[in-house]
């Protein structure tokens, strides 16, 4: 079954539409419209249920639409992330460890529903504890979030930066592309950051990430909007 979903996700990538920057104004209007297919409570319910009929476009509305929700806090992190650190240093993971990973992974997702690291962890923990359905659900969500982000640009120039709503997602996307961050980070323009990477076979010196939405929401919250 796990192999089947990997095949399905690969086929989805063949239907990938042209890269397009998120239109936050349009997203905000549609997710607030109760008659829209993108009405956020309804769409988010489908996400929680890991509805396989959700498309990359649906995930664009889910991911970027989250920034319009009161639950979204720019630059927030989970208090439970530290509880998982111990497991990354263990040579062997037992059943009790798996259950703890599941517990804390789900706690992270309660406040950060698009946390790629928690989803990857749950994919692993559920798979090795024998719950293939929940493992596949976590993998589906993570892969589709990544596809949604990659649909926003190439990441190879400041005018085509990948739009992220979570600062950690810059590092997650580098890892997804098998690029290692080299510690170089600089502002490219008023909404884009450059992240340098070590020498690689792709001849990529670094990637650009558009974090303008984090800035915007932070500013709006400070003004009390």
Identify the role of each PLM range:
Residues 1-23:
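Bacterial Sec-dependent N-terminal signal peptides
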Residues 19-98, 159-225:
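N-terminal alpha-helical interaction modules that lie
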Residues 80, 119-122:
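TPR repeat positional signature
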Residues 97, 104-105, 138-141:
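Alpha-helical solenoid repeat scaffolds, predominantly canonical TPR units
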Residues 109-110, 143:
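A conserved position within tetratricopeptide repeats
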Residues 116-117, 144-158:
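Boundary/linker segments of alpha-helical solenoid repeat arrays
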Residues 127-150:
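TPR/TPR-like (Sel1-like) alpha-helical repeat modules
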């Amino acid at each position: 079954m796990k192999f089947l979903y990997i095949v399905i996700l690969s086929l989805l990538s063949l239907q990938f539409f042209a890269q397009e920057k998120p239109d936050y104004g349009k997203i905000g209007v549609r997710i607030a419209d109760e008659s829209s297919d993108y009405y956020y409570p309804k769409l988010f319910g489908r996400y929680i249920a890991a509805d396989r009929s959700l498309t990359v476009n649906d995930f664009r509305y889910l991911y970027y639409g989250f920034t319009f929700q009161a639950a979204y806090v720019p630059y927030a992190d989970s208090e439970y992330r530290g509880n998982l650190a111990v497991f990354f240093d263990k040579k062997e993971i037992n059943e009790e460890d798996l259950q703890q990973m599941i517990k804390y992974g789900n706690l992270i997702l309660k406040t950060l529903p698009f946390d790629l690291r928690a989803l990857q962890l749950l994919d692993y923990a559920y798979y090795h504890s024998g719950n293939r359905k929940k493992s596949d659900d976590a993998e589906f969500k993570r892969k589709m979030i990544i596809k949604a982000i990659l649909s926003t640009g190439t990441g190879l120039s400041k005018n085509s930066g990948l739009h992220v709503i979570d600062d950690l997602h810059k590092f997650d996307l580098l890892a997804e592309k098998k690029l290692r961050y080299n510690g170089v980070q600089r502002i490219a323009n008023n909404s884009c950051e450059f992240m340098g990477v070590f020498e690689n076979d792709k001849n990529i010196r670094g990637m650009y990430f558009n974090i303008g939405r984090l800035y915007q929401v932070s500013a709006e919250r400070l003004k009390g909007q």
